[in-house]
Amino acid sequence: MTAILERRESESLWGRFCNWITSTENRLYIGWFGVLMIPTLLTATSVFIIAFIAAPPVDIDGIREPVSGSLLYGNNIISGAIIPTSAAIGLHFYPIWEAASVDEWLYNGGPYELIVLHFLLGVACYMGREWELSFRLGMRPWIAVAYSAPVAAATAVFLIYPIGQGSFSDGMPLGISGTFNFMIVFQAEHNILMHPFHMLGVAGVFGGSLFSAMHGSLVTSSLIRETTENESANEGYRFGQEEETYNIVAAHGYFGRLIFQYASFNNSRSLHFFLAAWPVIGIWFTALGISTMAFNLNGFNFNQSVVDSQGRVINTWADIINRANLGMEVMHERNAHNFPLDLAAVEAPSTNG
């Protein structure tokens, strides 16, 4: 008998690396998107923490009036923020090596641009990693599609809006009070409350919260009883068991009687598709609204739209909101310009008698 022995070629280091990166047996899946995601998110997180604690004041408006945002410069967790890159930089790419010194880079708000660009790249890679893992496990791609909603929203406020406005200084500050300041200024300049895409986003977020609470409470309440009436229903179950613990037919019947028959789902897949699609579509529309308002396609303007027979204005809520917008705009960047942009754009009255 003749035996043929073949030498098995040892796998190259690159081959072993590829297999490890794409293995679904790892405790945490890395994937090719993860190769880019890990360093970008680590960079963004590290710089954010350091800057939030110790970054010096930033000349956000480009008028030599620095604004303090870090903890060591007098802020607390609520008031602290990473101050956006200076208006003097505009939309220029501003890495450390473009500045004359690190002090200049910090003064002009370089950390903000570094954090935002690394963060956006990182979350986009996280979305790609979700798709990649789903693909390798033979799943459908809808997890990544759902995650695209917050990715689109973050991209809108951190990248698209600054591009439309012409400067990273108009981006959203990275902090609690900074976020609220961004929202107030956005309302003052773009009347976002009167934009239909924002209204769809509000319906998506609040509606999604309501539907999630309704679904969770229904599932928790419609248990398949495995015990007698003298025992707790909880005694009939163990954590992580394979058998179903609730009856969707019972939940459907309860909800149908609570509202009306066709207000409830009797199909689990249809129900969960609805729960995913409602907030995702709403947030997509909000991101689209921010992206259009970035280029000054603003919310509806119904100011002074109701007048009496004498031509006198009868104020509506639109006029009240407009008055509030002007007040907020007066307070915004109060040292950068003397008048709100809406007032400054009006032609001056003639002084010739």
Swiss-Prot record:
Q: Which residues bind chlorophyll a ChlzD1?
A: 118
* Reactions catalysed: 2 a plastoquinone + 4 hnu + 2 H2O = 2 a plastoquinol + O2
NCBIfam families per the UniProt record, alphabetical: psbA (TIGR01151)
| Entry EC no(s) | 1.10.3.9
Please list the residues that bind a quinone. 215, 264-265
The UniProt record gives the binding positions of [CaMn4O5] cluster as 170, 189, 332-333, 342, 344
Annotated positions binding Fe cation: 215, 272
Keyword set includes Iron: yes
Stated role: Photosystem II (PSII) is a light-driven water:plastoquinone oxidoreductase that uses light energy to abstract electrons from H(2)O, generating O(2) and a proton gradient subsequently used for ATP formation. It consists of a core antenna complex that captures photons, and an electron transfer chain that converts photonic excitation into a charge separation. The D1/D2 (PsbA/PsbD) reaction center heterodimer binds P680, the primary electron donor of PSII as well as several subsequent electron acceptors.
> Which keywords are on file for this protein?
Acetylation, Calcium, Chlorophyll, Chloroplast, Chromophore, Electron transport, Herbicide resistance, Iron, Magnesium, Manganese, Membrane, Metal-binding, Oxidoreductase, Phosphoprotein, Photosynthesis, Photosystem II, Plastid, Thylakoid, Transmembrane, Transmembrane helix, Transport
* Sites where the protein binds pheophytin a: 126
Give the top-level enzyme category.
oxidoreductase
Identify the coding gene. Answer: psbA
Recorded hits in PANTHER family, A to Z, give: PHOTOSYSTEM II PROTEIN D1
Q: Which Gene3D superfamilies match?
A: Photosystem II protein D1-like
Q: Which residues carry this modification: Phosphothreonine?
A: 2
**Localisation:** Plastid, Chloroplast thylakoid membrane
Q: Where is this site: Cleavage?
A: 344-345
Mark the transmembrane ranges: 29-46, 118-133, 142-156, 197-218, 274-288
The residues the record assigns to binding chlorophyll a PD1 are: 198
- Keyword hit for Transmembrane: yes
Which BP terms does GO give this entry?
A: photosynthetic electron transport in photosystem II; response to herbicide
| UniProt similarity note | Belongs to the reaction center PufL/M/PsbA/D family.
Q: Which residue positions hold the site described Tyrosine radical intermediate?
A: 161
This chain belongs to the protein called Photosystem II protein D1
